[in-house]
Amino acid sequence: MRKRRLWWFVVLFRVTLVGAILPNETFDVRRYYADRFLIEDEENGSSRSYYISAESKAKAAEQFALLAPNCSLTSDIQENTCNETSSFCDHRVDSTYKTYHYEQEKCNCFIETCDEETNSTELMVLYPDCYCGKREKHCDLSKEKCHWTPDSDHDDLKFEVFESSNKVLFDYMLQAGSEKANLKMNKVSMVSKFFRQSGFNCSLRFMHHFTHQSSTSRLVVRSILQSGEKKNLYEHWLKPASVFWVPVQVAIGSYAEPFKISIDCETGFPPKKKKNKPFTCSIADIYFENCGEIRDPIEQCSRGDQFLCSISANTRCLQNAQCDSRIDCDDESDEMDCGNINGTMCDFNGQDYCNSWYQVTNVTDYHERLSEPTTVAPLNKLNEVPLHLFRLQSPSAKIKEAMRGSGNMLVFDHKPNPLTRRTSALVSPELPRTNPEAYDEKSPLFKSCKLRFYLCSRTYSKVWQISVISKGINPMESGRTIIYEAGYTLIPKENCTWERVFVNIPRQNAGFRIGIFVTNYFPGSEEYVAIDNLSFSPTCFERDINQSTWDIPDLFINTCGASGFEQPQNCDHNRELDGQTGHFLKEDGTQQWTVPVTGFYRMEICGAGGGSNSKASGDTGDCVTLQVHLIENLSLRMLIGQMGESPCFTEHDDELRPSSCSKISHNYVYDGKRGAAGGGATLLTVEKDLWNVVAGGGAGASWDGFDMEVGYGASAIHVKPDQRCNETCKAVSHTDFIVERRDNRCPGEKGESTVFGGFGGGGNSCGMLGGSGAGYQAGNPFGKSRARSGSSNVSIDFSKSPIYYQSERLDEGYIKIAFCRKRCEPPTVCRFRKDYFEEEYCGCPDGSNVTDTEEACAFPLVCPSSSTNQYRNFTYEPFCLCNNGKEIYDVYNDTCEEIQIWTLYNITFLIFAALTIIGALFVVYHYRNREKQMKQEILDLTQMKSPDYLYDDIYFGRTTRKAALDSLPSISRDSIERGRVLGRGNFGEVYYGEYSGVKLAVKMISRTFSASQASQSDFCNEALCMGTFVDENVVRLIGIDFEKVPYMIALEYMEGGDLLSFVKECRPNQVSLNPFQLAMSDLIKICCDVAAGCKCLETFGYVHRDIAARNILLTTRGPQRVAKIADFGMAKEITYGTEYYRINGRTMMPIKWTPPEAFIDGVFTTKSDIWSFGVLCWEVFSLGVVPYPNRRNEEVMLMLTEGARLEYPYGIPTRVYQLMRDCWKTAAADRPKFVDVVEIFQDIQDDPASVGMPFPIHPAVRATFAHSQSTPVSVETPMTAMTEISLNSTFTDASTVKVSAQQDMQDRIQLHELMLTREHPYTSELTSYVVNSIRKDLARVQYENGLTSVPQPEYLSPENNDESVQLIPQSNTVTDQTPPTSLIDLNRLGVQNTGPTLHRPDSLNFNDPYSSVPLLECQTR
């Protein structure tokens, strides 16, 4: 009799070790089979056989008793005997367990269980989807054939059967709910019958439509054992984003004891008041699936993405659930032994995102904000700090939690709304290489390495992405592979639905990182992204992985399928094959590779061959094989040469030979006598301006005859062309290895028939001669044999003893890189033998063989005591590194010279210290004797001022102050939509606002200052000034509100911030020498705007008194910026005569922006603003350097009084500095008016010689920028500090300054003469009194600060009248930062703020070179 066998379990005690990881190593397979029946049905359904594994027949009888009716024990139990034909014989049991057999005469899915106490029976189902005959898969709710029973604890809440209007999904449905009943913590359920057992793949499927009456409403699926123990299998509690039916699949698993399933709809608490939310719960299409298949769980749950729960009572096969921060097994075995590799699990509940992950942000460009700013910045100082776009957030009404109790999540939702477009990246720590088994098609772990996370998003496309980042690469630079990119997920409602995302991780043969990138493309939009519970599959990494693995794959870098002149376009396929080892394609066609591990590497580098014609083949390229020592994270840039093009002789040759036939000339039918183009060279470099390795390209094939219409290939060194190379030859020759197709085309009509050289500088051909090959020295196209091909070269400081040879194949160029993998015990290192560098061996660092002596592999040099033993990178040559940075290779003839130098330094220091102590004692003694006399002689300037005020009120438009205020536009503060605070101080605060769509900066005086009459006067004065001066270069007044306290002024909002902060941020930084890409014309335009605003003030007869870069605001930081004058708190109208007025009383003023007549006589005129404007121009062109660096205010006053002026900033146009000197004339009458200044600047803007000058970047800064890119060499510390630049080279005498190629020497001479020109000293009745008082005050301040040993500069001596004395002491001492405006009380001449302590920097600070080095072109003597 043929039998149809249904196997629910197959193997009793076989554990299959698959790959590197088991589904669950703690699973008890014997216990699993002792609790479950194996069932076999006859093919015709007439009988059914049961098998059980037990220790004895009696134990088996206890199990089979559940199957016998009427509670009677059966004696018809037999021990099963295996034969070869029985499929059960393939699966043996151990000696303690045997298999027993019991047979029933018919198929039966129902079991009558008895209760001995009540002597009653209850119907139980064998397993959930058991059937005999025709299968009733779906529960027809209209009939009584279902294994389900409704239950409810409320009379108005019961399930009723309804016929579905949509027959496509289902025919009938169950629905329970009530609109009027007061439902509070009630429940309506559908409960199944008890089932004897189930398979481990058993699941329940149904559809539900659930309407919440409150946030506590939920739908729960539970399993209930006979003992009453309950377990939640599924929970639905989130409010739906749509009104559609939700299909559900609930994993039940394999139960070994009777159980039943309950679908519970819980109402929760009633809804809040005034909210009518009826509760409804609808269920349809209920059925079980795969519940009888009790197969061998280990064999059936053995894939890499599966996990078998270890409890035999309820065994489940989980999919993508192991190590995902969520407990799915009752014994928590799915989350055991997880997180061994740092950073592979992240639930975002920590304080720093997750374990070792970090966030970086890159500002990409500037743009105008589209909504209210949330970045707090003062109105007059835009100190912008990059804000990260990702942040941690707890669940909210907008974004619910991904799972119950999951906690914080990673969110991007534009809340920071930064002023600039930026990109943030959440970057993982360095991860080891991926498990090779996960990428082997024959392995059960194939395609199991995934990145898993929960996602809730509402975004446009490409707003965020997940990428693989190669080891050692800056996350914001190129060299990353996108593995997941956001699509268009903008949904109509605010709430989004969480979904689980699985992303395949490409194979990684070396260490790598994962980065989650987001860019705020659309500021102010309603986009948001939420990510939670991010984890890697445990099969991604080997269990015993060594994170510093030596298993580095060989790397083969080719042209990525490109040929001829076309640059490589796509190398993704190659990157996938080599396992993402840090190799990627750059925009210019070069390729970059990052060294994964420090050690020796073998490189085989070959140039490309030349093109061929119908007569001959082109020459092959050159090859170089070498050995080089590379350090980890070093970037190598490579250009792979491509074959030169071959001429097309028919219209279809390009189809037959697409890789080398000239594509541009296929419409031109040649006469057959044409030359081919030369091959490109293959190059490698670790420096920007030097090719360390050049493998020459082969020459293109030539035809018989001679012509001169042929070109040279590119050359790394200068090549003198052959005398036969005419102008045409020179025109079609290459000067660079990276050339574009349109360059060096053949002249005239033959331009369309150019046969182009291969990428990498191959020479073009225009006639019968073939183009020469590119190389270290390009080949001569007029030469013979190999002289026409390019030569090869390896720089001596990159590799020693390279092997040069000619390639045997006419092919594209390539580079092969192999790592020396042999593990060697220190001090030996893995190296390659010098015969073709193929054999690996463990040798001494210098390449010699290891001996058994004590001196084996000893350092070959005896270094001085003040030096350390080092090995040079690349060549691995030994040398001694002195403490002063000097490198010694010949220890017998060279020394560090450090001991002698330091001895001299110590002696000098001791002498200086002794003199300092003696001088200090003398000054203290002298000061004590004259202290009383000095205090009596200090001049009180208030006694020298006229006691009469020159004005009692300020008149605007010849009206009273009140009338002028009444004429200003008024605005109600209640109509302003208030935003964030932009700035706050003692006077009050400034906040952002919007009024009728107009952006405002609202300034409010505090209540304390509102009570002061003087403060009210100043506040009104500022409003009157801005309301009177209506000009495009003056900040516009929108309105005022003086009706109630605190007073309010509404001004136009200036997004660009203050001018001083802007020019400081224009300085070179570590990323760019010109961050804002400014030109000289931009700086001139800013100064012209300020002059135009001052012209408006001059027209009205007002003096601003505080013209400085800090008081100038910019409309934007982009190219359309306009500078406007602000802060009129010190502005006064001239009411005495028509030209000036005199101040009296305690007056504070910015000394470094003030002319001599102001701080000596207290006289301010419009010419005073002219002086201040000249200092402002100096600030702009010096990029925010404080005027008169390192000078106290007292020193500045003495300098200006004696006729000294500021030096010119580096790179300033001569005409601009001439105008600045005109503004600083001693006599106010000699200074120009602002009308004249505006005309001069307009003329300068039309002068190409001025506006065409480069952006002023000091050579010291350029040198520092270049040195910052270098890689110092050290075996022990490979990443040392940047090479120090001597400050003495920065400050040179004018006669030694190198002449710039962009500026005429005559202009430089004129600039220097202007700078050396000394103005007439300022003299008045008060000059001598003020100067003497300043000298005394300066001496007193020095004594109080303990500076008694500081010698007095010569120019401070009252007896010194020699104008040749240096007014600006020659010193490299500079301030660490630009000090705030220093103010001097003219009545007491006491220094209020002298700035930070002076110090001498040890090296050039590249982070802010303008604050550490005064960028003056030369020093004055």
UniProtKB/Swiss-Prot annotation:
Residues 21-903 are extracellular. Residues 339-542 form the MAM domain. Changing residue 1001 to T: In qj141; defective olfactory adaptation resulting in impaired forgetting sensory responses to the odorant diacetyl. Pfam families: ALK_LTK_GRD (PF12810), PK_Tyr_Ser-Thr (PF07714). One of its GO terms (biological process) is chemotaxis. It is found in: Cell membrane. Its main location: membrane. InterPro entries: ALK/LTK-like_GRD, ConA-like_dom_sf, Kinase-like_dom_sf, LDrepeatLR_classA_rpt, MAM_dom, Prot_kinase_dom, Protein_kinase_ATP_BS, RTK. Residues 925-1421 are cytoplasmic. The active site is at 1106 (proton acceptor). The keyword Transmembrane helix applies. It is a single-pass type I membrane protein. It comes from the Eukaryota. Keywords: ATP-binding, Cell membrane, Chemotaxis, Disulfide bond, Glycoprotein, Kinase, Membrane, Nucleotide-binding, Receptor, Signal, Transferase, Transmembrane, Transmembrane helix, Tyrosine-protein kinase. Residues 300-338 form the LDL-receptor class A domain. GO terms for molecular function: ATP binding; transmembrane receptor protein tyrosine kinase activity. The chain crosses the membrane at residues 904-924. Probable tyrosine-protein kinase receptor which regulates the dauer/non-dauer developmental decision probably by controlling daf-3 transcriptional activity in parallel or together with the TGF-beta pathway. Regulates integration of conflicting sensory cues in AIA interneurons. May act as a receptor for hen-1. In AWA neurons, together with hen-1, plays a role in regulating olfactory adaptation by controlling the forgetting sensory responses to odorants such as diacetyl. Interacts (via cytoplasmic domain) with fsn-1 (via SPRY domain). Belongs to the protein kinase superfamily. Tyr protein kinase family. Insulin receptor subfamily. This is ALK tyrosine kinase receptor homolog scd-2. It comes from Caenorhabditis elegans. The gene is scd-2.
